[in-house]
Amino acid sequence: LSVDYYNWKIKNEVKTLSTDQLLLAEYQCHNGLPNNTSASCQNVTDWVTRDAGGNLTRVYTPKLNVASQNLEAVTVGAKYQQDLGRFGSLMFSGNYTNMLKREVVALPGAQKLDLLSDPYNMWYYDNFAKVRGDVSVGWAISKFTTTVYANYVGSTPNYLAYTGRSYDYVHASGAKAGKWGSYTTYNMSLNYQAQDDLTLSLMVNNVFNKLPEGQRYNYPGNESTPFNDGFYSVYGRQISAQVKYDF
């Protein structure tokens, strides 16, 4: 059994300045206001190019050391093996991760963003689930080993929470922002040690062919992927075979 606590504080993180950020900085520099980047007004002037009529012709978006992050997480891992004598052995394994804090400051002087409570920025910056986990049970006997895996993704913001920037957002159609429930998929594998240097394997991912179909009602019809493809796969069940020979 292992329990770990992590606390990462990252400063001067490299970030690409966006076109919007630079155009806003240009406006601020021209009007004697503090600009919203760590770049000088001379840099901003060099990076934003306009023609004689003042029309925008080019914006150079450089990478600068501007962002900072604060992340806290706890992880728990466990492994156990039980000898069954002539019936082989059972292997158990499990991992759990809980994000306790996830804060981002995108630019110097900018507001600190709490990604755990802000569905828009949670999706925009990292696209993560607060809680994730996996468990596996394996059985080894003679030359055979079979394993069943379960992969767990905790609740995540739905699309309306992201676009409405709040879990309380209600669309004009009456559709409500909120969270998707937890999502679990199962994988299986079977290995046969034919020889000391030859292993045959059969693997099935997403055994029950689970798909994020329930999410599509929350998306507009013009979205190419009506689900959060950062977490969920549209491929469904996948079966593969492998022959491994060690030289």
What function would you assign to each model-found segment?
Residues D4, G77-K79, S136-G138, S189-N191, ...:
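Outer-membrane beta-barrel architecture
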Residues K130-D134, T185-N187, N228, Q238:
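Transmembrane beta-barrel architecture of outer membranes
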Residues K176-G178, N191-Y192:
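Hydrophobic alpha-helical bundle architecture
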Residues L1, Y6-W8, Q193:
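Structural signature of Gram-negative outer-membrane beta-barrels, strongest in the C-terminal barrel
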Residues N70-E72, A129, S182-T184, D196, ...:
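Residue-level preference for beta-strand/loop junctions
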Residues Y60-N65, S117-Y124, R165-D168, A172-A177, ...:
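Extracellular loop and loop/strand-boundary signature of outer-membrane beta-barrel proteins
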Residues Y6-K11, K15-Y162:
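Gram-negative outer-membrane beta-barrel transporters
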Residues L100-K101, Y149-S166, N191-F247:
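C-terminal beta-signal and adjacent terminal beta-strands/loops
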